[in-house]
From Swiss-Prot:
This is Protein E6. GO terms for molecular function: DNA binding; zinc ion binding. It comes from Human papillomavirus type 6a. Belongs to the low risk human alphapapillomavirus family. The cancer-causing human papillomavirus E6 protein has a unique carboxy terminal PDZ domain containing substrate but low risk E6s do not possess this domain. The gene is E6. Pfam families: E6. It is found in: Host cytoplasm; Host nucleus. Belongs to the papillomaviridae E6 protein family. Forms homodimers. Interacts with ubiquitin-protein ligase UBE3A/E6-AP; this interaction stimulates UBE3A ubiquitin activity. Interacts with host TP53 and EP300; this interaction inhibits TP53 activity. Interacts with human ZYX.
Length: 150
């Protein structure tokens, strides 16, 4: 894959595929952390989560699901600022909570309205990591709750 054109224009999986006239199913891309090739499911998931493609040494990289979760947990421990309810997020950002881009702190998916409302209804806090508000998506919320059950 010739990288000069891609590194300047492609920032997402979709753009990378368009630049090189590939389908996501045929795209081969490695994880920036562990260097393993992402599975087709991980590539689709990465695109769905609207995560950016990184360029290292002129080549595009993404992150596999395992490394995304691992680095999400590391980020939680290293860069935790504080936690706050939806009202805190709104006061700080001066935006309605539904308009604020909040990602899941484990899988990095942008939270939808339902997930943000669940935080509000259950009085769950959002957390601020490295100056960015994070929460839990429904998938990771369920996974976290399963770990707490006997």
């Amino acid at each position: 894959m010739e990288s000069a054109n891609a590194s300047t224009s492609a920032t997402t999986i979709d753009q990378l595929c368009k630049t090189f006239n590939l389908s996501m199913h045929t795209l081969q891309i490695n994880c920036v952390f562990c260097k393993n090739a992402l599975t087709t499911a991980e590539i689709y998931s990465y695109a769905y989560k609207q995560l950016k493609v990184l360029f290292r040494g002129g080549y595009p990289y993404a992150a596999c699901a395992c490394c995304l979760e691992f680095h999400g947990k590391i980020n939680q421990y290293r860069h935790f600022d504080y936690a706050g309810y939806a009202t805190t997020v709104e006061e700080e950002t001066k935006q309605d909570i539904l308009d604020v881009l909040i990602r899941c702190y484990l899988c990095h998916k942008p939270l939808c309205e339902v997930e943000k409302v669940k935080h509000i209804l259950t009085k769950a806090r959002f957390i601020k990591l490295n100056c960015t508000w994070k929460g839990r998506c429904l998938h990771c919320w369920t996974t976290c709750m399963e770990d707490m059950l006997p």
